[in-house]
């Protein structure tokens, strides 16, 4: 159902956290494949991809071009782009599946972005409110996950 594309830039720690969060989706059959697109000259990410059972794509160029290259290599009709270090909330599998079914039923092209989660230890207040308003004005961030049909 989904191909997940993660631009890693050679940073192992953040990519591993994201991969660990995707395990339930793979076990549920929602994730068909994960592509790690790496723009570094390090072999670390290739080893991580091998151990995690991911596809690995080395790419030279901009981050946008790397994401496009990952999309071209993906095999699934739906693409999920995740920033390395993104850890999806527990309900992401159900929400993604419902979104895909809704889009298929409507026949209209749509894309979805993942909401930011509130850190459990933060004090909600004016600062969070200002951040929310800023996000509404500027639109989605590149750090938010994107779910889109081919």
Model-assigned labels for residue ranges:
Residues 45, 59-74:
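Glycine-rich, basic loop-to-helix element that forms the pyrophosphate-binding segment
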